[in-house]
Every structure is written in structure tokens, then in C-alpha cells.
């Protein structure tokens, strides 16, 4: 299906690298018109040109700094004005800091919360009427880090756990008749963020994860781990007695 005659638009927030870029490619290939949102305009332009050439896709872009934008939802709404009706919102953008171990300044805590929590809430609130009108899908990206709080990724994990509450609120208030709310608790993925880092498990392939997410758009509301093997890791972490868990401070 050519995206030039596509009946609907998917918004990918965090579209310039890793899973977001893989999702942009997968959705373009499936015939969606796209609004790609990321912080770097040049990266977005290059991705859009590639997707337009390879898939005859209709692609709009919006450069947005989620750490500093007070109302990202309003900016995205304005960018959607000339695109087909909105059918999917995929909130992939996220950031973590190596020193998120109770060492962060107030300013850097604010940056983490702006990107990982404020922006998803603001964007969902702004786009909710459009998504309800089309019975669309909201995809939130959580993290295995939220399974149990540790002395690392303190703010990041707190924000990701809060997204679990947002997902539950969307399901309770609007699913299944008005929209679909899908939460993916992501494990380690092979991206530039994990390159060169010694990981405790084999990282997942962003292209494979993107295909799974794209294939499930519109197919119910749920929360699940991706890659699926990380569900066992999270279950073990939650089941550990406190005396054992508290020793895992590395």
C-alpha cells in the first residue's frame, strides 16, 4: 500500500535512532503516513528522505527538544494538521544517565523527568481526542528497570514505573471501545546506547521488536515484555526476598 494514499497517520516520538528509527521504517513499509519527532532536524530529514525513496511514504518531521519543550503535545497537534487522520501514537523517546544513582543535580533530574514522564503525559493528553475519534492505538515504552527499584537508574526507573500507571489509566478510562493502550516493558536492545556495554543478557534486535510492535497495532490493550525473555528476569527480580535483593548493588 502506498503511503501517498494512506488512510491514517502514525506519530513516532523518538524516531531518529534505535527502536524509533526501526519503527519508522516498519510503519512506512506497512503503508502508514508518518510524523517523525526527534531532537535533531538533520537526522529527521535524512530518515524522511530515505523512507520516501524506499517506500513512497508520506513523511512529515518535527524537531522537538523534549527536555525543554513546555507543551510538546501542542506542537505535534499543529504538525498533524495537514496529515491524514491519526491512528497510532508511539512514544519511544527516552533517556537514562550513567550517574542516575542519587548523584544527579536538580536540573538533570528535571531533564530525565521531562523526557521520560512529562512529555508522554503531555502528548497523550493533547492527542487523546484525535485517537479516540479513530479508535486508535497508544504505544508506551516502559522498561525492565521499573520491575523493582534499585540504586541505579533511580529517576529513570521511577519515571518508567509511572508510565505503568498512565497505561492503566488509559485502559480503565478508554479501552476497549474508544482506543487501544499498549505498554511494552523493554529489555536491553542492541542500539548505540548499549554499544560497548557488558550486558547481563543478549540484547534484543530493534528491527525484530519494531516488527512485533507494528504487527500488534490496533489489536487490543495489554502490557508485555519485549523481548519476551525479559519477563522471566523481571519475575525473578520481584520474587527475590529483600535480604537477597538489597545485596544487588552493583
Label each region the model flagged:
Residues 16-17:
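Conserved glycine-rich cofactor-binding loop
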Residues 143:
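Residue(s) in the substrate-gating loop at a strand-loop-helix junction
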Residues 100-113:
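Substrate-binding pocket helix/loop in short-chain dehydrogenase/reductase
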Residues 124, 159:
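Active-site helix of classical SDR
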Residues 32-47:
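Conserved glycine-rich Rossmann-like NAD(P)H-binding loop of the short-chain dehydrogenase/reductase
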Residues 183-184, 198-234:
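C-terminal helical subdomain
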Amino acid at each position: 500500500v502506498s503511503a501517498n494514499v494512506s488512510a491514517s497517520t502514525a506519530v513516532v516520538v523518538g524516531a531518529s535512532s534505535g527502536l524509533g528509527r526501526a519503527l519508522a521504517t516498519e510503519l512506512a513499509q506497512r503503508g502508514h503516513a508518518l510524523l517523525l519527532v526527534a531532537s535533531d532536524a538533520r537526522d529527521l530529514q535524512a530518515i524522511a528522505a530515505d523512507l520516501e525513496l524506499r517506500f513512497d511514504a508520506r513523511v512529515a518531521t518535527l524537531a522537538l527538544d523534549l527536555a525543554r519543550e513546555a507543551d510538546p503535545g501542542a506542537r505535534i497537534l499543529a504538525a498533524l494538521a495537514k496529515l491524514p487522520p491519526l491512528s497510532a501514537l508511539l512514544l519511544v523517546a527516552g533517556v537514562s544517565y550513567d550517574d542516575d544513582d542519587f548523584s544527579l543535580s536538580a536540573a538533570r533530574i528535571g531533564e530525565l523527568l521531562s523526557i521520560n514522564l512529562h512529555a508522554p503525559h503531555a502528548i497523550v493528553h493533547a492527542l487523546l481526542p484525535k485517537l479516540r475519534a479513530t479508535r486508535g492505538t497508544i504505544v508506551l515504552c516502559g522498561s525492565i528497570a521499573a520491575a523493582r527499584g534499585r540504586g541505579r537508574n533511580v529517576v529513570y526507573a521511577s519515571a518508567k514505573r509511572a508510565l505503568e500507571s498512565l497505561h492503566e489509566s488509559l485502559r480503565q478510562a478508554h479501552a476497549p471501545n474508544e482506543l487501544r493502550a499498549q505498554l511494552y516493558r523493554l529489555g536491553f536492545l542492541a542500539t548505540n546506547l548499549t554499544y560497548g556495554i557488558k550486558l547481563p543478557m543478549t540484547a534484543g534486535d530493534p528491527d525484530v521488536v519494531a516488527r512485533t510492535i507494528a504487527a500488534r497495532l490496533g489489536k487490543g490493550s495489554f502490557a508485555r515484555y519485549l523481548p519476551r525473555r525479559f519477563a522471566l528476569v523481571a519475575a525473578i527480580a520481584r520474587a527475590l526476598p529483600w535480604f537477597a535483593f538489597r545485596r544487588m548493588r552493583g
